[in-house]
Design a protein with these regions (language model features):
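Histidine-acidic metal/acid-base catalytic patches
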Residues: 86, 93, 112-134, 140-258
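Active-site acidic/histidine proton-transfer and metal-coordination neighborhood
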Residues: 4, 11, 21-131, 252-257
Length: 258
């Protein structure tokens, strides 16, 4: 079917949160047998990705975390996750593992929950094929500035994949990108350009009660518009205004491009 329609596969996603076995975690589960199943599942996903000529497996360790104090030993959990992801990454170097962070849900507190911690984790694996998926909505939920997160991850060389959506910073609503945080999105698009990001940008949106096809159409329309505005920005002019510390001159300039 892919060949018939001239399509490629952006990523293979490994879900280690939906099945009952992952209720109390996957790569950080206290039982070694469950952790082994998580590692084996990652290796299988990497094999499937290679078969599809797809360079990346994405995974969000969202059941790896806690709901209550004293529920886990954090040092053990972090070490288990490192060991498991490192083993999977060493299994085949031709496929990247891109790990997605999130502050909470389904766990009250996810173990890998912000850009800095996720980048550090990726570095600690000591594997070049381990990196980070930056979900714009998750960055908002973690009270990050998405452009800052993109710039930071881009500079570390660990920005492997991007999800676009939007929310009010109170929950991961997966709304059409730019409909709530337009300023942040324009700055985010500029940051991706500045770090030279050339990977996939995936629409991670949820239709709620609206027509799914229209939601996807609007996602593409809004993202095209956002990147068009970002492309209009004279980076030399912007940098000079930033040196002069005139915030409202900057905002007026960006507003003139809308």
């Amino acid at each position: 079917m892919l060949d018939a329609y001239g399509l490629g596969v952006s990523t293979v996603n490994l879900n280690v949160k939906g099945d009952e076995i992952w209720r109390y975690g996957s790569f950080t589960h206290p039982e070694a047998s469950v952790r082994r199943k998580a590692v084996d599942a990652m290796k299988e996903a990497m094999d499937r990705a290679a078969q599809l000529e797809c360079p990346i497996v994405t995974c969000a360790l969202l059941n790896d975390g806690v709901d209550y104090p004293f529920e886990i030993n954090y040092m053990d959990a972090f070490s288990h996750a490192l060991e498991g992801i490192r083993e999977a990454a060493e299994y085949r170097k031709d496929v990247k593992i891109s790990l997605e962070y999130k502050q909470s849900e389904p766990r009250v507190h996810c173990l890998l929950n912000n850009a800095g911690k996720m980048a550090y984790f990726a570095q600690m694996t000591e594997q070049e094929n381990v990196g980070v998926t930056l979900d714009f909505g998750h960055a908002l939920q973690a009270l990050e500035v998405p452009a800052d997160s993109a710039s930071f991850l881009g500079q570390t060389g660990k920005l492997f994949y991007v999800h676009v959506n939007d929310n009010f910073r109170n929950w991961d609503w997966d709304m059409v990108p730019g409909t709530v945080n337009l300023w942040d999105y324009i700055e985010f698009a500029l940051a991706l350009k500045q770090v030279g990001y050339e990977g996939w940008i995936t629409a991670d949106v949820f239709p709620q009660r609206h027509d799914p096809i229209r939601i996807m159409e609007k996602t593409f329309e809004w993202m095209d518009y956002i990147f068009d505005v970002a492309e209009k920005i004279d980076e030399g002019k912007l940098k000079q205004m930033q040196k002069e510390l005139d915030t409202f001159e900057i905002m007026d300039y960006i507003r003139s491009l809308l």
